[in-house]
């Protein structure tokens, strides 16, 4: 038998991308499969590096959505550490959004830069409440109870365990003879001080004795290097922020720029508007080195207008999200896979990457979106149940859940989300989203490696080692697809079992 392997035109099955998406019917991720290619490499050889915009590269094609139940500073930090990026939502004041961005930009791995702090006149009962809510003690005490004031003590369990009167003020019980580290200390040196001194927390102070950050003994085992972290030229974590198209958002952009934001997402359900074009032009004129992702768009004409205005990246999707009802309510939008293919093909002429935004519920959806032209995937549903997402967990029927709501839900619009839908100031609100809950997914620091490994395995099955390779094969017609009938979709999922358990992730 011949050792020859067949990869090219002689034995092509299925359809090219052009043939698949010229069928004059809207397709979603479940409506097609990528046909397998030839494997001559290990999954570890697959590179997931990609571009967010013309100028910003990421080591992982994952972006957390600018939703108030998905991305604040904790999520953005975790995403950047793992090679992606988080986009801070704008259902807040300018000052609040800027503060969230600043937390990301000043983050140093292993240093707690926004520790819980109390003042000298707080009482032991306040510490009890923190322990119950957060699960830890060892709280720094500063002169006025804020981060940028002089450190005067620390309160630990040893100080308060046997104190019956929980109304005693902390200045009466706190430890004042403190071991501290000086601002600029390395994490390695800080850890050595903790080990030698046998203390639980090491406060880091500046030259004036003001609290800068905290290093915790409990984090010693958790701290690890993040070689794929998304960092700017000054080695700070990358972070994005969303703004609306309203005139008042120009002040928001200016403040975010001063805070060091890396990319602005102009957040609009229908991005093809004079409001968005004017916002793009304003940003490009005033902040020339600030990248812009415009959108949302689903057609080539929409993409053309925003690219001509100066967009560095495009966000694709109108109505595919799990909490979005735009297509049902407004009768406007487009099937997500078709939208990605058509806009990505057009945007590639200008070297503008596109983001697949919405409708992603598993690794297969991520792989499909990248295979048809997207460079990155923006996710809300997938990340909403993680530890780093805003909000507290709650239980329902024994299942651990977190709240997740669309930014066009009535609940979110009351908090300011209607700016995205040209609906601000209107007495009658028309919802284009819903509120719900999602199951606990654990930490982003464990979930992203799971998604990454699954994506590498998918790329291996396709026969390609990188996102640029797949995009080239798509353009050349070598990446082949097949439409799926309803019965094919049913057969490709779990079927015929009385019951089953389907764990999807296991860490060795």
Swiss-Prot record:
Its cofactor is K(+). K(+) binds at residues 319, 321, 324, 492. Catalyzes the conversion of inosine 5'-phosphate (IMP) to xanthosine 5'-phosphate (XMP), the first committed and rate-limiting step in the de novo synthesis of guanine nucleotides, and therefore plays an important role in the regulation of cell growth. This is Inosine-5'-monophosphate dehydrogenase. Pathway: Purine metabolism; XMP biosynthesis via de novo pathway; XMP from IMP: step 1/1. GO terms for biological process: GMP biosynthetic process; GTP biosynthetic process. Mycophenolic acid (MPA) is a non-competitive inhibitor that prevents formation of the closed enzyme conformation by binding to the same site as the amobile flap. In contrast, mizoribine monophosphate (MZP) is a competitive inhibitor that induces the closed conformation. MPA is a potent inhibitor of mammalian IMPDHs but a poor inhibitor of the bacterial enzymes. MZP is a more potent inhibitor of bacterial IMPDH. The active site is at residues 324, 420. The keyword Calcium does not apply. It comes from Leptospira interrogans serogroup Icterohaemorrhagiae serovar Lai (strain 56601). The gene is guaB.
């Amino acid at each position: 038998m011949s050792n020859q392997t067949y990869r090219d035109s002689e034995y092509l099955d299925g359809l090219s991308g052009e043939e698949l998406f010229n069928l004059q019917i809207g397709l979603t991720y479940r409506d097609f499969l990528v046909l397998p290619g030839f494997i001559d490499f290990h999954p570890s050889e697959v590179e997931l590096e990609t571009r967010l915009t013309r100028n910003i590269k990421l080591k992982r094609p994952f972006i957390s959505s600018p939703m108030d139940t998905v991305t604040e500073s904790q999520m953005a930090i975790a995403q950047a550490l793992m090679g992606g990026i988080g986009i801070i939502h704008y259902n807040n004041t300018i000052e609040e959004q800027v503060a969230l961005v600043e937390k990301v930009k000043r983050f140093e791995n292993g240093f707690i830069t926004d520790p819980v702090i109390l003042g000298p006149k707080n009482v032991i009962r306040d510490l009890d409440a923190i322990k119950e809510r957060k699960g830890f003690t060892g709280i720094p005490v500063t002169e006025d109870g804020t981060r940028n004031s002089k450190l005067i003590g620390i309160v630990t369990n040893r100080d308060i365990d046997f104190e019956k009167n929980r109304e005693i003020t902390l200045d009466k019980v706190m430890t004042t003879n403190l071991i501290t580290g000086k601002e600029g200390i390395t994490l390695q040196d800080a850890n050595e001080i903790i080990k030698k001194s046998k203390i639980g927390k090491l406060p880091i102070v500046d030259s004036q004795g003001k609290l800068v950050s905290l290093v915790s003994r409990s984090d010693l085992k958790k701290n690890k290097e993040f070689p794929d972290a998304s960092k700017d030229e000054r080695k700070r974590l990358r972070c994005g922020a969303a703004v609306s198209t309203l005139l008042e958002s120009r002040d928001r952009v200016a403040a975010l720029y001063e805070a060091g934001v890396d990319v602005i997402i102009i957040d609009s359900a229908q991005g093809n508007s004079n409001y968005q074009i004017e916002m793009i032009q304003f940003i490009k004129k005033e902040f020339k080195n600030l990248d812009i992702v415009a959108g949302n768009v689903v057609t080539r004409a929409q993409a053309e207008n925003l690219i001509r205005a100066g967009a560095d990246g495009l966000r694709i999707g109108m109505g595919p999200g799990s909490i979005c009802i735009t297509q049902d309510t407004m009768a406007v939008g487009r099937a997500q896979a078709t939208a990605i293919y058509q806009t990505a093909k057009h945007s590639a002429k200008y070297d503008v990457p596109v983001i697949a935004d919405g409708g992603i519920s598993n690794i297969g959806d991520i792989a499909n979106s990248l295979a048809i032209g997207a460079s990155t995937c923006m996710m809300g549903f997938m990340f909403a149940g993680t530890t780093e997402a805003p909000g507290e967990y709650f239980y329902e029927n024994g299942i651990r859940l977190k709240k997740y709501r669309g930014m066009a839900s009535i609940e979110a619009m009351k908090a300011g989300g209607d700016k995205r839908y040209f609906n601000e100031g209107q007495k009658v609100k028309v919802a284009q989203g819903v509120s719900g809950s999602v199951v606990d997914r654990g930490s982003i620091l464990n979930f992203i490696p799971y998604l990454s490994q699954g994506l590498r395995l998918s790329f291996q099955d396709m026969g390609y080692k990188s996102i640029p390779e797949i995009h080239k094969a798509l353009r050349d017609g070598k990446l082949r697809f097949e439409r799926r009938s309803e019965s094919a979709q049913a057969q490709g999922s779990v079927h015929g079992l009385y019951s089953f358990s389907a764990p999807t992730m296991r860490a060795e």
